[in-house]
Swiss-Prot record:
Name of the gene: rpoZ
GO MF terms, alphabetically ordered: DNA binding; DNA-directed RNA polymerase activity
Protein name: DNA-directed RNA polymerase subunit omega
Any matching Pfam family: RNA_pol_Rpb6
Biological process (GO), any one: DNA-templated transcription
Signal peptide: none
Length: 67
């Protein structure tokens, strides 16, 4: 299992506060049943960080706040 680090994610979203918000929103979406954009058997939070690190998810998550 490859480990995900904050440094990998910061290359995609340089502001760590925005990174946390984007990962939180995406993890919430995943836990509500949205399909992941990558192949993953991890928990929603880890999957969200992996999606960010791979560039599949970015700051657009801050404009799509789940309701």
């Amino acid at each position: 299992m490859a480990r995900i680090t904050v440094e990998d994610c910061l290359l995609q979203i340089p502001n760590r506060f925005q990174l946390v918000l984007a990962a939180t929103y995406r993890a919430r979406m995943l836990s509500q049943g949205h399909a992941p954009k990558i192949e993953s058997k991890n928990k929603p939070a880890v999957t969200a960080l992996r999606e960010i690190a791979e560039g599949k998810i970015g700051l657009e998550m801050l404009k799509k706040v789940p309701g």
